[in-house]
């Protein structure tokens, strides 16, 4: 009997040691020389890479070509978060809100950074506009939140991150000034877009965004007729359509109002270039 008890104790201690070892391994991976940071969308990856260079591996939760407003992370992705140093979210996306509970339940130690915490929120026809990253000023504010969070959890990199933040802020300020000058000369201050993803961009530069998609749904014939009339009255010359949508969705209305169709990618991993291309299209 004593031998059996001794064996049970030994096995139990072995299991405990294994659990502690696994936890220690996960912790070691999180604090490795090149730890992993997870972000919700590619534009946030761009910001992290501009700030941190190769200091972190950056994994993007939403696959390319998929809408982050409807995407649901897989169980494997959520499990992968156990090895991440931090999870950086936009803070406004549907899947972030629906899966946040699951994330905190399954990975309670995960440090989360709400990148849009200081971005003034914007309302649209469907409610809160989730596209908080779509302007240089928004990216600047997001970068500040990201550095604040990373410096808190990864203190030995704090000084370097603060230096790169200053450089990024200067870059975004310069881009903002460039776009402001450029868009002052835009003949038309109103544009049409299939999915209303440029509300923050429009707010910053005094533009007006009209959307084909209505309340997150395909538009009715009556709504389209009203939209065509408004576009004509306001002299709309550009119709944007996001990369993940078929341009044919806007081709008929563009033809009817005599506007050009321009494909954009608000989820690009180079949002700076996207802002430049959007301004260029509006000024041609």
Predicted segments, located by residue:
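Extracytoplasmic metal-acquisition and chelation regions
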Residues: 2, 25-284
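Bacterial N-terminal signal peptides that target proteins for export
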Residues: 2-13
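Bacterial N-terminal signal peptides
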Residues: 11-22
């Amino acid at each position: 009997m004593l031998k059996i008890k001794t064996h049970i104790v030994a096995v139990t201690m072995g299991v405990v040691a294994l659990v502690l070892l696994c936890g220690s391994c996960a912790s070691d991976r999180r604090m490795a020389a090149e730890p992993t940071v997870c972000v919700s969308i590619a534009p946030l990856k761009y910001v992290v890479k501009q700030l941190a260079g190769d200091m972190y591996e950056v994994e993007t939760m939403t696959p390319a070509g998929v809408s982050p407003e409807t995407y649901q992370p897989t169980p494997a992705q959520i499990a992968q978060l156990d090895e991440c140093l931090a999870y950086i979210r936009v803070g406004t996306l549907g899947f972030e809100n629906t899966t946040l509970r699951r994330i905190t339940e399954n990975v309670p130690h995960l440090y989360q950074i709400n990148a849009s915490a200081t971005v003034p929120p914007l309302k649209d026809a469907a409610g809160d506009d989730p596209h908080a990253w779509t302007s240089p000023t928004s990216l600047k504010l997001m970068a500040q939140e990201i550095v604040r969070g990373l410096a808190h959890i990864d203190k030995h990199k704090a000084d370097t991150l603060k230096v790169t933040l200053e450089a990024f802020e200067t870059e975004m300020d310069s881009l903002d000034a460039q776009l402001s000058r450029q868009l002052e000369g835009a003949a038309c201050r109103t544009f049409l877009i299939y999915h209303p993803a440029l509300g923050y961009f429009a707010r910053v530069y005094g533009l007006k965004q009209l959307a084909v998609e209505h309340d997150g749904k395909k538009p009715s014939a009556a709504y389209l007729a009203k939209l065509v009339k408004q576009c004509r009255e306001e002299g709309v010359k550009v119709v944007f359509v996001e990369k993940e949508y078929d341009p044919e969705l806007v081709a008929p209305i563009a033809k009817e109002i005599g506007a050009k169709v321009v494909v954009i990618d608000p989820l690009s991993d180079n949002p700076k270039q996207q802002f430049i291309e959007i301004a260029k299209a509006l000024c041609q």
